[in-house]
Amino acid sequence: MSDKIGLFTGSFDPMTKGHVDLIERASRLFDKLYVGIFYNREKSGFFTIEARERIVKEALQHLDNVEVITSQNELAVTVARRLGAKAFVRGLRNSQDLDYEADMTFFNRELAGELETIFLLSKPAYQHISSSRIRELIAFQQDIADYVPQSVIKELERRTYEKN
């Protein structure tokens, strides 16, 4: 098993082009990168966990060393240890992200001091994109093609088709 294993977690509800860019960049740093879709069955997401898994797998299928996993109601440190990960990978768009991620990093270090956290800065083109903004655009029936991978568009079309 490789020593260079990373874990990039998120809810990906929905995945954005910013997520894809960060994962592509992170995949070059590790022999194996797990992308963990973390969710809580008690909370309802915009997309089902199954839909998110389809979206993420399709968007990342070109990355040979990336594996998509799901985790329900588990701490990220527990999953990281189980997978043999040495580091978390987190994206930062702005200072608010840094504040949140720094707190999470300190907490994770208390629970699992052996795990490092690597921060990647979002490219300027993606700094304004967030999943919550995308959900808002969808709610107002705005075009989101510039902000999300094609797999999100396909999933929205599938959802529309299934409703009709």
Curated annotation (Swiss-Prot):
UniProt-annotated binding residues for ATP: 11-12, 19, 91-93, 101, 126-132
Residues the record marks as site: Transition state stabilizer: 19
Record-linked NCBIfam families: coaD_prev_kdtB, cyt_tran_rel
Species assigned in the record: Streptococcus gordonii (strain Challis / ATCC 35105 / BCRC 15272 / CH1 / DL1 / V288)
Record carries keyword Magnesium: yes
UniProt GO cellular component terms: cytoplasm
Keywords, in A-Z order: ATP-binding, Coenzyme A biosynthesis, Cytoplasm, Magnesium, Nucleotide-binding, Nucleotidyltransferase, Transferase
Pathway terms, separated by semicolons: Cofactor biosynthesis; coenzyme A biosynthesis; CoA from (R)-pantothenate: step 4/5
Matches recorded under SUPFAM superfamilies: Nucleotidylyl transferase (SSF52374)
Subunit note: Homohexamer.
GO process terms (BP): coenzyme A biosynthetic process
Keyword Nucleotidyltransferase attached: yes
Principal cellular location given in the protein's record: cytoplasm
Subcellular localization(s) per the UniProt record: Cytoplasm
Transmembrane segments: none
Record field: catalytic activity: (R)-4'-phosphopantetheine + ATP + H(+) = 3'-dephospho-CoA + diphosphate
CDD domains assigned: PPAT (cd02163)
Protein name (record): Phosphopantetheine adenylyltransferase
Signal peptide: none
Family named by the database record: Belongs to the bacterial CoaD family.
EC number(s) recorded for this UniProt protein: 2.7.7.3
GO molecular function terms listed in the Swiss-Prot or TrEMBL record: ATP binding; pantetheine-phosphate adenylyltransferase activity
Function: Reversibly transfers an adenylyl group from ATP to 4'-phosphopantetheine, yielding dephospho-CoA (dPCoA) and pyrophosphate.
Residues annotated for substrate binding in this entry: 11, 43, 76, 90
Cofactor(s) named in the record: Mg(2+)
